Amino acid sequence: PQHVHQGRVMVKLLEDMDFPVFVLSDDIAEAKVQTQVATQKAREINGPVALVVKKDTFGKFTAPKIDADLPMSREEAIMAAAEVLEDNAAVICTTGMPSRELFEFRARNEAGHHRDFLTVGGMGHASSIALGLAMAQPERPVYCFDGDGAALMHMGSMAITGQSRAKNLTHLVFNNGVHGSVGGQPTVGFNIDMPQIASAFGYVTANRVTTKEDLQKAIISSRLTDGVTFIEVQVRPGNRADIGRPTSTPAEN
């Protein structure tokens, strides 16, 4: 729903900031002319211009597949994690597919959605929201279900979380090596040592898991940790084509 409003105000917003705006045509010949004119304009003003692309302007494209011989999909990992959470645990879930998968898991199990905050349209902000909740409710276990792309997008928040020493917060990053919610473009998630980064930020424990058993053990062990816990869950890229969207609003939760 946030994209409807963003799309409605996009051109005016750019014009108000004095950007030359070109709405890209879906006619290839006209689009080529527009890009040439836009490029020339950028050179003339020695500054940026905006090419606004409407929905369905481009055809479908399959991104190169990332090879990952891992036992779990992200959805399977989210289900495995949710199975062992305390009854009073709060879950702050990152935007996109992870929130949709968690919502469907709760619906299938008739578990209700009252413990979950789905960070729809707020990529990269889930961990900050989770930290705020953990500080406000120190007696309540709080879990952040994050993605590799989202965590990398606002990694500065991990430094703040690591230095917070919040004893009731566990930060899980479901790392599938791609931006899975917006086309499958690769991240650098599989090329870096996320637990080592988390340790440098001050997380008390930081582990990497790939199996359901190790994931659930790590979550249960996190309850005994005297500080913030980080768990990287390496999973296969991809998601179900028929995954639904949340049918309730945050206010209804």
Feature-to-residue mapping (PLM):
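Glycine/aspartate-rich loop-and-adjacent alpha/beta segment that forms the canonical ThDP
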Residues: 48-87, 224-253
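Internal alpha/beta core interface subdomains
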Residues: 15-21, 31, 44-55, 230-232
